[in-house]
Amino acid sequence: MAQQKSEDRVVPEGGVTPVERVGSSPGGQGKAVPVEETAVQLSLPIATAENPKGATRRRTRDRLGEIRAGAPKAIVKVGMAAPATMEEVAFRLTDALLKVASNKGAPGPDGQTIEALLEQWPSVLPGLQADLLAGRYQPGGIRRVFIPKAGGGQRGLGIPDVIDRVVQEATRQVLEPLWEPTFHPSSHGFRPGRSCHTAIAEAKQHVEDGYGWCVDLDLEKFFDRVCHQRLAAKLAQRVSDRRLLVLIGRMLKAKVVMPDGVVIANEQGVPQGGPLSPLLSNVVLDEFDHELDRRGHRFVRYADDAKVYVSSERAGRRVMAGLTAFIEGRLRLKVNQDKSAVARPEDRHFLGFRLRVIPQTGTVEVLLSERSKRNAMQKVRELTPRTWEAR
């Protein structure tokens, strides 16, 4: 793409003068700019609380159609390997915007909505591309929220600004084809063509093959403990564009805005909530998958939930000890001893299900876990409160 200089800023040829990153001052740093103020500068309407919901949805739908129709055709189809360069990331930004918009989602710390970014996109895109290519782009903060976990306690999620989610999604589209072909087939989480259903099907097959004991490994706060240095080294094995590696490093180290407004540094971990996080978690645990394969184990992994199937309790305890040493020594992660166990598959839930062997036939049936049953009943009560009150 030919470029020309304008006030020491890189401007794509034929593009409009780039606007600064929404929510940031020039160079991607400084005080936040209110969304309403940015919209006035751009002379574009945005979604506000005063807009009727129906009108906002129609305008968003129409804007999506306009952007989709005007988007350039990808040089390489999404899902196919392309050079892992910043140019490829910049080229995929509009595709990434459409993906992020389809997922909806809440605003990040800067308060910008997806609807607002859609309206501003023609003016935002040239400047965003220029900042990425020049290495100037600085991600904003990550809004920390906590949601209840099915087993009790809370799970922390990190919600990036909408524009950062677009950049993360474009980066994911470039990186995923480089790793996807070499990920282990027993890894099922957040991968094309795989799901909870394929994971349960493989686990069921292992039990049917006579592996009637389960080594249930619980990685304690996995997403919060990922070592940035080890992850960076893994990425550098397949990505040679230093600008892209630096960008990913900035995403990982983006400051976290806690619910009480306190801002904290982020020196380790991969915050859950961004489009890039699931892929990076699989890159981290791919080494674990191939170590399990090297040792000849039957296993299934879905994100940070791993189950190894063995033929006896004694073998399971031996495997548990060996894998704990590998995880904590090599991967620098931690096994939660209180939640990990060697047990029969019917006594451990996996993705909301249990596997039980029918003694008379030797076949394996898939059952809802007790926790899933309770959650389902609670949901039914919430959806039909009057019915339950009448009883």
Regions found by a protein language model. Give the residues of each.
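Non-catalytic, polymerase-adjacent accessory regions of viral genome-replication enzymes
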Residues: 1-122
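Short, compositionally biased low-complexity segments
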Residues: 61-73, 88-105, 142-144, 172-178, ...
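Phosphate/adenylate-binding "loop-and-lid" substructures adjacent to NTP/NAD/dNTP-binding pockets
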Residues: 94-97, 106-154
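Conserved polymerase palm-domain catalytic core
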Residues: 124, 131-146, 150, 174, ...
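Conserved phosphate-binding loops in nucleotide/dinucleotide-binding enzymes
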Residues: 156-161, 366
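Duplex nucleic acid-engaging cores and interfaces of nucleic-acid transaction enzymes
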Residues: 162-170, 204, 232
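A conserved non-catalytic segment of reverse transcriptases
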Residues: 253, 330-391
